[in-house]
Amino acid sequence: MERKIIRREKEREYEGRHNSVEDAEQGKNCKSTLMTLNVGGYLYITQKQTLTKYPDTFLEGIVNGKILCPFDADGHYFIDRDGLLFRHVLNFLRNGELLLPEGFRENQLLAQEAEFFQLKGLAEEVKSRWEKEQLTPRETTFLEITDNHDRSQGLRIFCNAPDFISKIKSRIVLVSKSRLDGFPEEFSVSSNIIQFKYFIKSENGTRLVLKEDNTFVCTLETLKFEAIMMALKCGFRLLTSLDCSKGSIVHSDALHFIK
């Protein structure tokens, strides 16, 4: 009886050791199939088979030792690219198709990433998406910068890109904040309108006034020039001045930008 009990205990001990060895081996195999990448300071953990899905690409070359890649301080492969955009690259490798969040506006940057990682399929899908966006008519948005007491005074900026209108609006608000400790009641900001207390015309140009003490942001002419320069830098073109009777753009009441 005692011999049977001892024998069973030895069998259990052997089974436990055997299972531990198997678990350890499975753990090693699991780790060997995973890979941690440091892309521009962002860590991504994925399977090697995901990175090698498409042959003759940058990531496949790293996994199979065809391409030498530096390591970071923690021993992870370091790739000096856009860490935020890499998630879209990785999702393309996982899904085999391009899936982007609504309102994604970084097609050109993503196209550069696709080119760097040598993913022709991704590059083609990004290009196709960009071309479709260009063909899709975009609703024109506007920003009106007016006098609280006279809506006929001021400037209207029209554009077919809402994000650019927001950029100009943010710039005006930022400059205005730099002139004041806080916004007075006389200064009104809404979705499409920025209203100043007064537009005062002088020899130096129309001044955008905020407070009773005549603190002003800038001249209206300066604002027009800055809006035009911002638009050109962002790849827009000045379609026309909507009020051509004024002659010079500086004297126009409205500007229309298009991309």
Swiss-Prot record:
Its gene is Kctd4
Query: SUPFAM superfamilies given for it?
Result: POZ domain
The BTB domain extends over 33-134
Which GO BP annotation is one of this protein's? protein homooligomerization
* PANTHER family linked: BTB_POZ DOMAIN-CONTAINING PROTEIN KCTD4, POTASSIUM CHANNEL TETRAMERIZATION DOMAIN-CONTAINING
UniProt cross-references to InterPro entries, sorted A to Z: BTB/POZ_dom, KCTD4_C, SKP1/BTB/POZ_sf, T1-type_BTB
Q: What is this protein called?
A: BTB/POZ domain-containing protein KCTD4
Which portions of this protein are annotated as coiled-coil regions? none
